Structure formats: structure tokens, C-alpha cells
Regions:
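Short, Lys/Arg-enriched N-terminal segments with co-localized hydrophobic residues
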Residues: 26-48
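Bacterial N-terminal signal peptides
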Residues: 55-64
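Sec/Tat signal peptide C-region and signal peptidase I cleavage site
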Residues: 64-71
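Extracytoplasmic small-molecule ligand-binding "clamshell" domains
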Residues: 71, 78-149, 333, 340, ...
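Bilobed "Venus flytrap"/periplasmic-binding protein-like clamshell domains
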Residues: 84-94, 104-119, 173-231
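Extended ligand-binding regions for polar small-molecule ligands
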Residues: 110-113, 117-119, 181-184, 191, ...
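Acidic, polar ligand-binding/catalytic clefts
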Residues: 113, 117, 121, 125-192, ...
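C-terminal functional modules
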Residues: 331-391
Length: 391
């Protein structure tokens, strides 16, 4: 398959990675003039004391900063009366997109509603901030949003250099390719895309994975890079690119919005691991606990058969594990240990259902996407989704 090598290349400058503000550390030191009055032994002792003081002051400064942050987010969220959640500005059907009434819907959106329900007992106490890929981490680091739930891949650099804590993997995904089957009828594999112009969004893991894949397979390609997903979508739909690459779930979502969706085919290859999940700022352990245990609560509820329809009845169950999860034990305190009420899981499930219900409603059999559970099934059904025990 031959591709037009003269196709225009549009490339935006890669946005510099934002880094969280550093913690200022006071340094203790001795001036050189005073140190000169001592002999070698005294100088060595003074130098050792200097290092100890520096270390103690550094630990104290970092400890004070972490302690100050530890109570901040939950208290701030409660004080303002709502959760601020960062979602996809482009509107990714099934994950985060406004419906016909302007209400945000999707798997990522329902996770935020679950967190709001855990805190307030009301899943509607959440506001959504639409964010592009290049803005999402800065918005979280700066405190513009309390939590980021925006089809974001969990990587080591984001977990460390960007100062994020990922609460879990709400959707196991992988990067794929989509082509116009009518325009390229002979292409049924990504290995046939040598020389192709490929639409890709900047500031994403997708861009790097694309380069790695073509290099590994000794193929040439022309990246057509756009700053926003909206621009990439429009360029591909207009025919400016031979193929489009992003997370495979995203391709199914984007295809629904194309002028002629049925003309386009998602190729079978998955070229990367894309564990997608919500994240919070580092330095606030209590908030991190709430973020990750909300995710685990959704999974445990599905595993135990607790649904949006039966959760009230399940509160009367004699099953010890169900009683513990729903906070109906006489000495229940798991919720209060999190800074929440003991019926926090009841509130979550009443608001959004369990993980399986969220999946099917937004991206599964009950949605236009019709994506199979696959590896996103529970571990008891051959999948990777596994809720840590609530006990």
C-alpha cells in the first residue's frame, strides 16, 4: 500500500512537563571563619554536626509540608461542598462526555460521582473541569481540580516526576490504529502502514508508542501531530491522515462521531499497555486513601453481588463480608477511619452502581460502544479487575 509522502506535517511543540513546586528546606551551616579556629578533629565533628542539622531540618520541613497537605484536600472539598473533577475536554464517549442535556456522563465521570457519594452521600455534588492532555497535570498539581479522571495512562514518570498518585486502573487499554476501510481497502493490519501519515495528539504516551512501534518494525511514517484531540479528530475525518492512533477504547469512541462511522475500521493490533485510571496529588495520604478505596469498593460490590437495585436489601444480609463492606456491623469503623461515614459504600453503590454496572452502562453492552469486558472483567471471571479486601 503506497501512501502520499508529500502530505503536510503539522507538529505542535511538545509541552514541557510541569513539575510540582519544590519544598523549601532551611539549611544550617557554620561560617568558614569560625570553623578555622578548630583543629582537624573538631572540624570533622563540626562538619558531622552540620550534616545532622541539615538532615533534621530537611526532614522537619518535608514532614511539616506533608502534614499540612494531609488534611487539606478532604477538608477543602467538604468546606466548598463539592468535588472538582478533571475530565476530557474533547468529550470521549463512554468515558467523559456531555449528553444531550449537557450533563457529563461516562466511566471516568461515574468514578468522580462515586467519590462525591462517598464523601457527601450524594453523587451529584461534583463539578467537572474539561481538560486537554497538555493541561491536565498542571490543573491537578495547582489544585484547580481535586482529582483527575480523564483517560490517563499510569506510567512511572507520571507517578514519580510529576508527583501524582494513581488510585487504580479503572480501564485496562492498549494503543491501536483506525483507518478508513473504503479509502484503504487493502489495509487490515498496522504492519501495512509503512509510509502512512498518522494523526496523533501531542503530550501523550501515544506519540512515543507510535515512534517505538514503527522503529521496532523498521517502517517509515509521517506523524501529523495536533495539540488537542478535537483537532486530531477533525483532521482524520477530513482525510488529511491515512490512519489515526490512540487508545483503542478511544478509537471506538471517536469513530461514533465521524461523518461516516461505518467506513472506518479499528485494526487488530494493540501496540502498548495503557492502564487508565484516576490520579491525585502526592503528599495527601488521606485523600489518596479515599480515591483508591472508592475504586476498590466498586469492585468489591460487584464481586459480592451488591447492585444499585439491591443495595438497601443487602444491608440486612447476614454475610459477614457484605456486612463489613456496607458498614452494617455493630462495631463498624472502616468508614470513619477514612474520614467518611460507615455507610460510604452504600452511598457509592446507590449513586452509580458497582463497577460492572458502570462498565456496561457506559462502554459495554448497554452503550453504543458495545465493548466486551475482556481483561476488564473481575479476576473471578478471567479478568484483571481485583478489589483489595475491605476489612
Amino acid at each position: 500500500m503506497a501512501f502520499d509522502a508529500t502530505r503536510e506535517r503539522e507538529e505542535s511543540a511538545r509541552p514541557a512537563g510541569a513539575h510540582p513546586a519544590g519544598t523549601g528546606v532551611r539549611r544550617a551551616y557554620f561560617d568558614d571563619g569560625q570553623k578555622a579556629k578548630y583543629g582537624p578533629e573538631q572540624q570533622q565533628r563540626a562538619s558531622g554536626m552540620k550534616k545532622i542539622l541539615i538532615g533534621l531540618l530537611g526532614v522537619a520541613a518535608v514532614g511539616w509540608t506533608a502534614a499540612a497537605a494531609s488534611a487539606a484536600t478532604l477538608d477543602d472539598v467538604k468546606a466548598k461542598g463539592f468535588l472538582q473533577c478533571g475530565v476530557n475536554a474533547a468529550g470521549l464517549a463512554g468515558f467523559s462526555a456531555p449528553n444531550d442535556k449537557g450533563e457529563w456522563t461516562g466511566l471516568d465521570v461515574d468514578y468522580c460521582r462515586a467519590v462525591a457519594a462517598a464523601i457527601f452521600g450524594d453523587g451529584s455534588k461534583v463539578k467537572f473541569t474539561p481538560l486537554n492532555a497538555k493541561d491536565r497535570f498542571t490543573a491537578l498539581q495547582s489544585g484547580e481540580v481535586d482529582i483527575l479522571s480523564r483517560n490517563t495512562t499510569w506510567t512511572i514518570s507520571r507517578d514519580t516526576a510529576l508527583g501524582l498518585n494513581f488510585a487504580g486502573v479503572t480501564y485496562y487499554d492498549g494503543q491501536g490504529f483506525m483507518v478508513n476501510a473504503k479509502k484503504l481497502p487493502g489495509v487490515n493490519s498496522a504492519l501495512q502502514l509503512s509510509g502512512a501519515a498518522i494523526c496523533v495528539q501531542s503530550g501523550t504516551t501515544t506519540e512515543l508508542n507510535l515512534a517505538d512501534y514503527f522503529k521496532a518494525n523498521k517502517m517509515e511514517y509521517s506523524p501529523v501531530v495536533f495539540e488537542t484531540q478535537q483537532e486530531a479528530d477533525a483532521a482524520y475525518d477530513s482525510g488529511r491522515c491515512d490512519a489515526y492512533t490512540t487508545d483503542q477504547s478511544g478509537l471506538y469512541s471517536i469513530r461514533l462521531k465521524l461523518t461516516t462511522p461505518d467506513d472506518h475500521m479499528v485494526l487488530p493490533e494493540i501496540i502498548s499497555k495503557e492502564p487508565l485510571g484516576p490520579s491525585v496529588r502526592q503528599g495527601d495520604d488521606k485523600w489518596f486513601d479515599i480515591a483508591k478505596w472508592t475504586y476498590y469498593a466498586l469492585l468489591n460490590a460487584e464481586e459480592l453481588g451488591i447492585t444499585q437495585a439491591n443495595v438497601e436489601d443487602m444491608k440486612n444480609s447476614e454475610n459477614p463480608e457484605i456486612k463489613r463492606v456496607l458498614g452494617s456491623e455493630a462495631d463498624a469503623k472502616i468508614g470513619t477511619d477514612l474520614g467518611l461515614t460507615n455507610d460510604w459504600v452504600v452511598n457509592i453503590v446507590k449513586a452509580v452502581g458497582n463497577y460492572g454496572e458502570i462498565f456496561e452502562r457506559n462502554v459495554g453492552s448497554g452503550s453504543p460502544l458495545k465493548i466486551a469486558r475482556g481483561i476488564n472483567a473481575l479476576w473471578t471471571k478471567g479478568g484483571l479487575q481485583y478489589g483489595q479486601p475491605i476489612r
